[in-house]
Amino acid sequence: MKTIKLTLLALAVSSASGYALANGLAINEQSVSGMGTSFAGRSSSAQDASTIYGNPAGMSRLGREVSLGGAYIHAKIDIKDASGRYATGTQVPGSNDGDMVPNSVVPFGYFVTPVDDRLHFGLGVYVPYALISNYEHAFQGRYQGQASKVEVITIQPTVSYKITDKVSVGFGPTINRIEGKLNSNLTAGAFGGGDAQVKVDGDDTAYGFNVGVLADLTDDLTFGLTYHSKVSYKLKGHTEVTGAGSANPTFNALLGRLNGKYDGSLNLTLPESTDASFTYRLNNDWTLYAGATWTRWSRLQSITVENEGTPTLPAPIGNRLGEVTEEFNWKDTWSYALGAAYQLNPQWVLRAGMAIDPSPVDNADRNVRVPVGDRKTFSLGAGWSPTKEMTIDVAYAYLWEDNVKVNRAPDALRGGYNAKYDNSAHGLGAQLTYRF
C-alpha cells in the first residue's frame, strides 16, 4: 500500500535537509553570495561563477574563476493538536515530537573560463531538489510517512555568448540524477495484526536545460531573465513489505501475502520556472536588487504508481499495491525578493534581503513528508576580498512559515493523521571564489 509513497521519491526532492530557502520541493542554496540578499537579483547580478545556475548568460562578465561552497540548514518544527485514528475509529497510539528534519549541508561548485572575447564555458554541480526527514519510531502519523531521504543532483555544462558589450545569452543542458529511500508503516489492526514496515527505493537520470539573457538597460540598470526547464523522470525501483500478519490464522494467511519485494515505476515531471530580476547601481556604494520567480507547480496534480506481481486480497484490502494514484493538486506560485548591497570599502561588501514564497499546496492536500506553508525569509550577508583573486562570502538566513494543517484520512491499511505544523529554519552559508 505504501508504494504510493514512491510518488514522493520523485517529488520530495526542500534542501538536502528537508528545509530550504525556497518553497515546495525546490532549493535556493546554489549560491551564498546570492543568499545574502535572499536571492533578489539572482538573474541580473553575475557576481561570481554561481551565475551558472542563476543566469548562464552572466558568465560573459567573468574571467576564469571557481566558486565552491555550501549552506548549513537547521530546521525547527513543532507539531501541535495532533490526533490519529484507524478506519475503525479507534485512536492511533504514538508520539508527536516534531523536529524530524536533521541538520545537514547543501554543497555546490562552479567553474567558468573564457574561450575567447565573446564565448565562455562553465560547469556547475548543485542540488536543485531534496528532502530528508526522520520522524521518531512511534510517530502517530507513521502510516502517512516516517522516514524520507531523496536527492536530485545536477551537473550543468554551460556556454555563454556576448552579443554586444551590453547583451549576452547563455545556455546549459542539465543532467539530473534522482535517488531516494522512503520508510513508512501500514496497519492490519482491523484484522488482528500489528504494524508492517514498508521500504521504498528508486532512481532515474533525466535531462533538461537552463537558458538566460542578461542586458544592461542603462549604465546603472541591468535586467536578467532565466528559464529552468521541466525535467521528466521515469523512476524505477522496489517496494518491500515486511511484518504483515495476524494472530488469527485465517487473516495471517491473507496478510502474509503482502510481504515481499515488488518492482515499481512512475512517470514524474518536476516543474519549470522563470526568474526575472533587476540590479540597480544607485551610486558607488549602494546596489539594489529585485526579483520575481514563477514556478509551474501545477504540473503536480496526481501521480500513478504501477507495481508488478502484487497480490489481490479480499475486500476491503483488494489489490492496493497494483496501481495507486496519489492526488497532489498543487498550484503555480510567484515568489518575490528585494535586496541591497553596501560597498563598505574595496575589501568588504555587506548584504541584506527579504523574500516571500507562497506554498503550492493547500491544507486539504498537505502531507507529513512535505508539510510546507507560505514562507518568508530574511537574510544578511557579507563578502570579503582580501586580494583581487579571492573572495569569501558568508550569509545567514532565517525563514518562518504560516502555521499549516495536515489532514489525512484513514483507510484499511493506513491510520489517519491530523495536526498543526509550526515551521522555521536557520541557514548559514559560506563560499570561496578564486580567480586565476
Model-derived regions, located:
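Outer-membrane beta-barrel porins/channels
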Residues: 21-34, 38, 86-93, 103-436
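Gram-negative bacterial Sec-dependent N-terminal signal peptides
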Residues: 1-22
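Transmembrane beta-strand segments of Gram-negative outer membrane beta-barrel proteins
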Residues: 26-41, 60-78
